[in-house]
Amino acid sequence: MNVYILVVDDEPDVEALFRQQFRRELRAGRFQIEFASSAPDALKRAAEVRDPSLILILSDINMPGMSGLDMLPKVRAAHPDVPVIMITAYGDAETRRKAIERGAVGLLTKPIDFAMLRQEIDTRLEQAA
């Protein structure tokens, strides 16, 4: 099965960072990573994909226009079985509460702990198999 992860972040260097961190997995074809630079773009890309090939969405919270928190209920309504993990520089309790209330399964703080993220992806890959 061809599975992919959708990463949503308005920072241009995020794509290069993720491709570098997951270069072995991407080369081996374990999964694909798609990138969206805004919440509306992410909603469009997610709508073009059929479950269960989309196994995880990682989204920044602070983005111009529609924030990641504003996107959450919309993406959860369209893809209720796809977990969403929010990424933020602000890991305070209030931000975490808002993210969980709106449907996120977790919150990662920047700089991202890629070892922990890799474990999360491995779990999602096992569930998709």
Show which residues each predicted segment covers.
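Two-component/phosphorelay signaling modules centered on CheY-like receiver
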Residues: 12-34
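Alpha4 helix (beta4-alpha4-beta5 surface) of REC/receiver domains from two-component response regulators
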Residues: 70, 77, 91-106, 119
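Receiver (REC) domain switch/active-site region of two-component response regulators
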Residues: 113
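Active-site T/S-Asp motif of two-component receiver
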Residues: 58-60
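Receiver (REC) domain active-site loop signature in two-component systems and cognate sites
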Residues: 63
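A Lys-centered signature of the CheY-like receiver
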Residues: 110
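Acidic, metal-coordinating helix/loop segments flanking the phosphotransfer/catalytic sites
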Residues: 19, 35-56, 77
